[in-house]
Amino acid sequence: MVAAGDQEHGRRGMTVAPVSLASASLFVACQTVDVSFSGDGAGAGSSGGLNWGQQHILGAIRNLGSSMNMCAVRELPPTAIVADFAEELRFYLNRFQAMRTLLRFSADHPPIQVVHATGTVPLQILDLAADADDAAASAALTALVAEHEQHSFDDEHEFPIRMVLIRRAGILTHLLTVLNHFATDGAGAFAMYEDFLNRDPVTGLARGPVPIHPLDLTAQQATAAGRRQSDASLRYWEKQLAALPTRRPTAAVPEPGSRYRRASLRSVPLLLGATRIAHRLDCDVSAVLLGLFATALARLTGEQQIAAQMLVSNRFRPGMANIVGNVSQSGLFVMDVADTTVDDVIERAQRAVTRTYKYAYFDLEQWKALLASVERERGEELALCYYNDRPSQRGGTAPGTQPSAETVAAAAAQTAPIVWTELPFFNERLMVTIDSPPDDDEAVTVLVSADSWHVPRKDMEELARTMESLAVAAACDPATLTGVAAVVEAAG
């Protein structure tokens, strides 16, 4: 329940001040245009609480201590004018409640989301020196993007979208759009832009109504049907976690250097091998990578049954495909990889991940309580590996042209280096991320992030290298085994 004062505040117009960053010193002038908006919906709805996806992303932002801002740079034609981008910003604000939502925090209650019907948002125009060369202009833009990536939004007072125009010698050259990740994920950002591109050319209005807003989703999840879905998901988690074998407790072992690290492997043979396997098994590349990950993790841990959390986009659910908001949550992936082929693991993984997706939709606070209860009963902390396949979150990962076994083997002969990055903090023991940029279709990048006091650097590298070597071996020989033996229980 939200206080009446907050509801009234949501109905009134609100002005947000422009953001001031250190990189502004690289520019010779700064101008601000206040863009007004007027959209449907206001206040906090019947409950004002956060929906499950919002709970998840806010928790991730807090745990990481990172803004997780999303930045996009658009190069502009010489004919671009400021008024066009004021209208674009107004379109997003008028149409999408997520872009005009602020949060209210209280020590006594969970966060509340408040939608504003009217208000203004600043559109900034930054001027480069007229005599700035291309190198200076590029450096200034790079610095601006880097600062906006790290400059957190004020969730209580700043609407979750910033637009900054770069001007050089009187000509607009670039648009930087910054989104607060709490407001939407990448798929939602693309949906916003698609709606803008497909608007009516005469009226400038969208061609249809918004299917659903985040506040609508909050109301849906509070219904009896929503509660049943959450309860079913939590029962699945409880059953699967209770069945996992207990592990021998291990103490943290400090390593020299930074405790939190990321190993990055950009692998051509991994993509080629996975593509060849995908053609053989008639599946997506993402399914192959999941099976390779499961096998590599089992080899590393020595456990025949692996359990991992997966980031699941719930956009496959009815009415949620194009929502501008966050609908991703953790799913639980469990499967056995012992005494079988890599091909078989990949096919099993496709069946297992269906359950993962089905039960990745639940009330986060109840989920936290369940995990705490399970850990008490088991007498150990459940530090599961996290797996995130970013390309599969953007859409399908159908394989490209089928490479020959010779092509895969030739690529494997060239060893790519592991690139190490020190992290200031990381909130998981171990996380594997498939991170293939849309403009890189020649390789797949595996990011292994970890607390190196629990997962040594050699194990981080081994995990990425094993995924690659398994892909090459299985691409060339369908009979390739996982190399994981079944554990035989002692009699008596």
Model-predicted regions and their roles:
Residues 2-63, 87-131, 159, 212-260:
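Short amphipathic alpha-helices and their capping loops
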Residues 11-16, 28-45, 78-94, 112-157, ...:
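A short, small/polar-residue-rich loop/turn motif at beta-strand boundaries
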Residues 12, 62-70, 97-98, 157, ...:
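His-Asp-centered acyl/peptidyl-transfer active-site segments
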Residues 20, 53-57, 81-99, 137-148, ...:
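Structural preference for long, well-ordered alpha-helical segments in enzyme cores
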Residues 30, 37-47, 64-84, 155-176, ...:
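Gly/Ser/Thr-rich phosphate-binding loops and adjoining beta-strand/alpha-helix segments
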Residues 37-38, 42-115, 134-222, 354-366:
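Acyl-group handoff/entry surfaces in thioester-processing enzymes
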Residues 54-77, 106-132, 157-162, 172-173, ...:
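Acyl/amide activation-and-transfer machinery of modular secondary-metabolite enzymes
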Residues 96, 100, 190-194, 304-311, ...:
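Extended, hydrophobic beta-loop-alpha segments that form or line the acyl/peptidyl-thioester binding
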